[in-house]
Amino acid sequence: TQANDPANVDSIRHAKLLYISGGDQNRFMDAVAGSAIEKAIHEAYRNGAMVGGTSAGAAVMSAVMITGNARKKTGYSSTFNTIETDNIETRPGLGMLTKSIVDQHFVKRSRHNRLISAVLEYPKLKGIGIDESTAILVKGKDAEVVGNSQVLVYSNTKRSKKFVKSGKLGARKMMLDI
């Protein structure tokens, strides 16, 4: 496969800039998970390469990646109507960001419920909602917002998840930074 082709792997391993385009984050991870390409991306990053992505390419940066699918609702919707337990489908991403979950097209597509649900399901992780035409530049523990819109960061400060009646999720003292 192309994900294990030595020429592709070598090209990525020695790259100074890797940019992962949009599309479907699940298809990307299906193609690269466990492959030599995935290892080469991490090696390039450790060697100082800048790794970035847009849309699905931003979503794959997380260790815990939102797939975009709801477990309890059939059919695709860009937003989630409720904040409830076991509704957010996740899978392993590239793991470039190990302490946060990234969601994309955030403000434009009103994905607050989806990211809040993910942060409640994974209370040790921050939720980073990146809007369209906007990016975060992460260097070590610092992040800078650039672009035309906003980045919202949800933190579950008590690192707890509370089940409310009917399978809904709740929490106290969540923090929002814009």
Placement of each model-derived feature along the sequence:
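Glycine/threonine-rich flexible loop motifs
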Residues: 25-35
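Catalytic-core regions built around general acid/base machinery
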Residues: 11-14, 35-48
